[in-house]
């Protein structure tokens, strides 16, 4: 499959959904290898890469490095990826079954909370430990996150919450958190950058973005108690002009030397090969690997539903949501009791759990007019619920 590293003067173009800092160390170390080929990275969102590669491959991309199985599934369905065989079993068991013929897992990451200690101290707040904590009223105007439609990394984090807590309880948690958001970041690594700058005190991020910032004493990262494992995948474009060199790079990443480099804290990731017991990062790697895998079939089937629901429920009405939650928190504080009926109006979604797993119904979201009609219905539904919640709050004054 992979071949050996030989001397090439040509340049490899690697499209990636990761930030430049997340790939710099790996590429830097690769390029110290005898006979290695230069790698130029093209850093884009998944959506941007889909558009680029669905048309003529104008940038002459040779391979893809991403944590997004959705992007790879899309490219595979459009016959854009080359077949890859003979990958190690330990690597391939981490790859969703539907893309195993074209994609290889070379590293893993986990999800958690990046926290700005100084910003937290300025507000006299304890650090949040999990999704549930982020919905507490004390974090009003203090949190940041991205959205599934803007970031596939965020999509996987949201799906891990929905799968672990269940559809209904998961959305209730997300909607409670929405009342505490400063803004919705356009990129998942933008969340980390904004927290570092002090725009917010905490936010959910993938560990490799957080770990690269932890030389800043004001920042801390804590994994979610049951963080799902998020593999880093590599795939070769079918029309790559340098397929042998691309395979050589993948071979290097999976080699003992490549895995040692991926084990280095400078990558912010963990290798797929087990770390030795005396490695300080071994325990967290084992915890991640021990978690049940996400249901990727379900993720892929309801990708459109989750993205459109998040934007309709949260992104497109964030200002109104924050006002409604501020009013609810104020009323609960004043009355010194919870208001579950009003809270239920602000934490419900107009799609039930059974529908969220109904593949026949979910397939209809591939029809743009159906999806847009549903979003219009949801907008009205959320607006009516919010108006009713505000009306009930005013009655309590």
Curated annotation (Swiss-Prot):
This is Phosphoglycerate transport regulatory protein PgtC. Its main location: membrane. The chain crosses the membrane at residues 102-117. Residues 1-24 form the signal peptide. It is a single-pass membrane protein. It holds the Pfam family SBP_bac_6. One of its GO terms (cellular component) is plasma membrane. The keyword Membrane applies. Required for pgtP expression, it may act jointly with the PgtA/PgtB signaling proteins. The keyword Ligase does not apply. SUPFAM superfamilies: Periplasmic binding protein-like II. It comes from Salmonella typhi. Keywords: Cell membrane, Membrane, Signal, Transmembrane, Transmembrane helix. It is found in: Cell membrane.
């Amino acid at each position: 499959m992979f071949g050996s590293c030989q001397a090439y003067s040509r340049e490899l173009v690697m499209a990636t959904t990761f930030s430049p800092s997340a790939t710099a160390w790996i590429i830097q170390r690769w390029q110290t290898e005898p006979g290695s080929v230069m790698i130029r990275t093209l850093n884009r969102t998944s959506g941007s890469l889909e558009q680029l590669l669905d048309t003529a491959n104008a940038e002459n991309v040779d391979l893809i490095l991403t944590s997004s199985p959705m992007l790879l599934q899309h490219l595979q369905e459009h016959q854009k990826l080359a077949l890859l065989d003979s990958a190690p079993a330990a690597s391939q068991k981490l790859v969703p079954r539907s893309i195993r013929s074209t994609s290889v897992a070379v590293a893993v990451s986990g999800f958690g909370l990046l926290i700005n200690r100084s910003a937290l101290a300025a507000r006299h707040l304890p650090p949040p430990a999990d999704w549930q904590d982020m919905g507490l009223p004390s974090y009003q105007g203090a949190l940041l996150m991205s959205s599934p439609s803007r970031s596939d990394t965020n999509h996987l984090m949201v799906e891990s919450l929905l799968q672990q807590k269940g559809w209904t309880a998961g959305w209730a948690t997300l909607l409670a958190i929405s009342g505490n958001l400063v803004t919705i970041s356009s990129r998942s690594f933008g969340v980390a950058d904004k927290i570092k700058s002090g725009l917010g005190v905490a936010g959910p991020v993938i560990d490799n973005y957080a770990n690269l910032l932890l030389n800043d004493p004001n920042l801390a990262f804590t994994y979610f108690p049951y963080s799902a494992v998020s593999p880093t995948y590599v795939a070769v474009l079918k029309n790559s002009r340098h397929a042998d060199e691309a395979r050589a790079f993948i071979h290097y990443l999976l080699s003992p030397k490549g895995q040692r480099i991926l084990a280095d804290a400078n990558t912010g990731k963990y290798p797929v090969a087990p770390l030795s017991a005396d490695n300080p990062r071994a325990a967290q790697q084992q915890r991640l690997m021990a978690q049940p895998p996400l249901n990727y079939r379900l993720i892929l089937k309801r990708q459109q539903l989750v993205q459109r629901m998040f934007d309709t429920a949260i992104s497109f009405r964030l200002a109104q949501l924050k006002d409604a939650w501020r009013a609810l928190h104020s009323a609960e504080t004043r009355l010194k009791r919870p208001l579950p009926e009003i809270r239920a109006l602000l934490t419900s979604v107009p799609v039930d759990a059974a529908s969220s797993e109904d593949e026949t119904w979910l397939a209809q979201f591939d029809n743009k007019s159906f999806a847009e009609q549903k979003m219009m219905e949801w907008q009205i539904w959320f607006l009516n619920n919010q108006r009713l919640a505000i009306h009930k709050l005013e009655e309590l004054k």
